Amino acid sequence: MSPRLPAVTARELLAILRRHGFESVRQSGSHLVLRHADGRRTTVPVHSGKTLGRGLLRQILRDTGLTADVLTS
């Protein structure tokens, strides 16, 4: 069974992704595209303080190759 994902805002997630080597590439409206030096990329919707849905958060983790553990550390 997978661990329950914590409630995370886009701002918090962006800080975590940047700590793991992701950089902003471009922004289209409220969607920020980030890319890692090894080619992994993902899109994060940035909406004023709202928490990201669990399904979206799970997909972003899958896109980036990170685990749910990085969200709690």
Language-model features: where?
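Basic nucleic-acid-binding interfaces
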Residues: M1-S73
